[in-house]
Amino acid sequence: MSQSTSVLRRNGFTFKQFFVAHDRCAMKVGTDGILLGAWAPVAGVKRCLDIGAGSGLLALMLAQRTSDSVIIDAVELESEAAAQAQENINQSPWAERINVHTADIQQWITQQTVRFDLIISNPPYYQQGVECATPQREQARYTTTLDHPSLLTCAAECITEEGFFCVVLPEQIGNGFTELALSMGWHLRLRTDVAENEARLPHRVLLAFSPQAGECFSDRLVIRGPDQNYSEAYTALTQAFYLFM
């Protein structure tokens, strides 16, 4: 079913079990984040970390997908976004399980003793270029605040041996990110190439890395079928979240 009906209200996005206000966040709720939150492997996880939490979307999606015993830490550098994430989480069914931290992840990590089974991030990927309208949007879009080597290092410092570190990136940038991760000792375990329809080349890639070596499973996801409605595969992946699916 095509999500033609608007699910925007009060400058946010309504899902089946929660609402995400994002009017004070530089980066809004979008398909990339929804894909990542629905795709990341959660079987057996006990502790999750969301790096660059923004509006809290990924933390909320993980909370919906996991048991009541799972604790989620959401770290966001920008204070307005972190405050809005906290408000979104407070209004959700999982407020007691999600901890929002207004902090620089590189500093926050050094103070942690716990390790995470699942680390998730929808990271910046633009190199410095065209000036953004606000410093907050520039921070969210560009890798100047947290570049990819630093992101991979942060994840490596706090992941369990069998844990997964999951990201979503544009296809070509994802290929470069994979090369970098492999050179730093990570192992690629899951890869899903995402295309808008069968006729188009993949434009996004979902990646799951682990410190532990193992077989890499790869597949392809097409978002829309020939009729321009959501494909069966995309519907199966996201229907627990989309309000009109």
Curated annotation (Swiss-Prot):
Its main location: cytoplasm. SUPFAM superfamilies: S-adenosyl-L-methionine-dependent methyltransferases (SSF53335). Keywords: Cytoplasm, Methyltransferase, S-adenosyl-L-methionine, Transferase, tRNA processing. GO terms for cellular component: cytoplasm. Disulfide bonds: none annotated. One of its GO terms (molecular function) is tRNA (adenine-N6)-methyltransferase activity. GO terms for biological process: methylation; tRNA processing. It catalyses: adenosine(37) in tRNA1(Val) + S-adenosyl-L-methionine = N(6)-methyladenosine(37) in tRNA1(Val) + S-adenosyl-L-homocysteine + H(+). Its EC number is 2.1.1.223. InterPro entries: DNA_methylase_N6_adenine_CS, SAM-dependent_MTases_sf, Small_mtfrase_dom, tRNA_Adenine-N(6)_MTase, tRNA_adenine-N6_MeTrfase. Coiled coil: none annotated. It is found in: Cytoplasm. Pfam families: MTS. Belongs to the methyltransferase superfamily. tRNA (adenine-N(6)-)-methyltransferase family. Specifically methylates the adenine in position 37 of tRNA(1)(Val) (anticodon cmo5UAC). NCBIfam families: tRm6a37MtseTrmN (NF047853). This is tRNA1(Val) (adenine(37)-N6)-methyltransferase.
